């Protein structure tokens, strides 16, 4: 399974086109098979090329940001932009960087400790029914997250007070400690324990958030599930993750979809499969039957002489294409012919006459054997 293309190129998700191009050129030179003969270099070179192919094109990159690999691959798992479906920025991928354990994530990249810091991304697993995945719709979710403190407006300082330079590190954010050893003196530099590397301390902490600047809250969100999503689809909801620190932007919310199985239907890409049991007479003579589809009842023609396991097609009754719901797959129905194990005397008489007409011997194997043979003529 492909990894995260941003990680492959070593750039952040907000990298511009020039940054992506520079990263690609640097890595392409490093891993080009003509230059690098180490095992795995050629495969790495292919990954780099694929990542650049996706991230260098704005439209493809947008789909990747929304659906991850599924948004840029073929078939029924292509990406879908929900930016036009409400206030949410966009939407998945199966596995990607930036998540830690539980609902929180790791901050991306190393930033100045006293500068604005982007909030963590959050992950939520959401269960959908088979029908919800096919046709989409709105779902209400509840998300525990860190929200910017309204009392101190995220500063962590008590209203009316501010911050001052840390007296321990004099604003440097680091402290230096010398250690004497038999081999000489060594200097060890570490983050200031007083200001945690920010270089500043709050004069008086905000009582509402205890000086943190953020509070744990649970919020309700309504998200739009587009038609045609599949098990493992990732929806990205922009800026609905944890609030940032010191004026930094909020992280994103990633919703991973888990689709329940259905007792009647099986999904294969954009197609839906199901079985239909018919009697041997219906298979021999043909008929029209009502069958279940995801859209409700539909009429299906069973041609005369239909063989067991014949697959019949109901066009445009399958899964809508992700991002273009006007295009749909088909519903493929496998015909299962029921051959009776017991028949009454009247049925036997009629079948014996039929066997005589066809010139079939039905002594060996009985009439049941004769019936089975009818479907292979």
From Swiss-Prot:
Keywords: Chaperone, Cytoplasm, DNA replication, Metal-binding, Repeat, Stress response, Zinc, Zinc-finger. GO terms for cellular component: cytoplasm. Its cofactor is Zn(2+). One of its GO terms (biological process) is response to heat. GO terms for molecular function: ATP binding; heat shock protein binding; unfolded protein binding; zinc ion binding. Binds 2 Zn(2+) ions per monomer. Zn(2+) 1 binds at residues 149, 152, 206, 209. Zn(2+) 2 binds at residues 166, 169, 192, 195. A zinc finger (CR-type) spans 136-218. It is found in: Cytoplasm. It comes from the Bacteria. Residues 4-68 form the J domain. CXXCXGXG motif repeats lie at residues 149-156, 166-173, 192-199, 206-213. Its main location: cytoplasm. PROSITE patterns: DNAJ_2, ZF_CR. SMART domains: DnaJ. Belongs to the DnaJ family. The J domain is necessary and sufficient to stimulate DnaK ATPase activity. Zinc center 1 plays an important role in the autonomous, DnaK-independent chaperone activity of DnaJ. Zinc center 2 is essential for interaction with DnaK and for DnaJ activity. Homodimer. Participates actively in the response to hyperosmotic and heat shock by preventing the aggregation of stress-denatured proteins and by disaggregating proteins, also in an autonomous, DnaK-independent fashion. Unfolded proteins bind initially to DnaJ; upon interaction with the DnaJ-bound protein, DnaK hydrolyzes its bound ATP, resulting in the formation of a stable complex. GrpE releases ADP from DnaK; ATP binding to DnaK triggers the release of the substrate protein, thus completing the reaction cycle. This is Chaperone protein DnaJ 1. It comes from Synechocystis sp. (strain ATCC 27184 / PCC 6803 / Kazusa). The gene is dnaJ1.
């Amino acid at each position: 399974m492909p990894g995260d293309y941003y990680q492959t190129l070593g750039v952040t998700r907000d990298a511009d086109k020039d940054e992506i191009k520079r990263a690609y050129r640097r890595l392409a030179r490093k891993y080009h098979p003509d230059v690098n003969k180490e095992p795995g270099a050629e495969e790495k070179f292919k990954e780099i090329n694929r990542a650049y192919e996706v991230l260098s094109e704005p439209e493809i990159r947008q789909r990747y940001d929304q659906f991850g690999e599924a948004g840029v691959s073929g078939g029924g798992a292509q990406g879908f932009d929900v930016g036009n479906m409400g206030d949410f920025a966009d939407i998945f991928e199966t596995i990607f960087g930036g998540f830690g354990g539980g609902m929180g994530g790791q901050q991306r990249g190393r930033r100045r400790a006293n500068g604005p810091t982007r909030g963590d991304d959050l992950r939520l697993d959401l269960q959908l029914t088979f029908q919800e995945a096919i046709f989409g719709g709105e779902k209400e979710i509840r998300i525990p997250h860190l929200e910017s403190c309204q009392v101190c407006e995220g500063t962590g300082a008590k209203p009316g007070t501010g911050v001052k330079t840390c007296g321990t590190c004099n604003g440097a954010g680091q402290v230096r400690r010398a250690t004497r050893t038999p081999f000489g003196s060594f200097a060890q530099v570490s983050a200031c324990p007083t200001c945690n590397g920010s270089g500043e301390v709050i004069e008086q902490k905000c009582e509402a958030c205890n000086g943190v600047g953020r509070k744990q809250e649970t919020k309700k969100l309504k998200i739009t599930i587009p038609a045609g999503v599949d098990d493992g689809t990732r929806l990205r909801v922009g800026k609905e993750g944890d609030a940032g620190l010191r004026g930094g932007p909020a992280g994103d919310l990633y919703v991973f979809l888990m689709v329940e199985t259905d007792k009647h239907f099986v999904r294969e890409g954009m197609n839906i499969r199901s079985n239909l049991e018919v009697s041997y007479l219906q298979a021999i003579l043909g008929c029209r039957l009502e069958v279940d589809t995801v859209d409700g009842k539909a009429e299906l023609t069973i041609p005369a002489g239909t063989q067991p396991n014949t697959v019949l097609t109901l066009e445009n009754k399958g899964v809508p294409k992700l991002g273009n719901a006007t295009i749909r797959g088909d519903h493929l129905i496998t015909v299962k012919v029921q051959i009776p194990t017991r028949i009454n005397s009247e049925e036997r008489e009629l079948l014996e006459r039929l066997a005589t007409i066809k010139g079939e011997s039905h002594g060996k194997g009985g009439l049941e054997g004769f019936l089975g043979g009818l479907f292979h003529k």
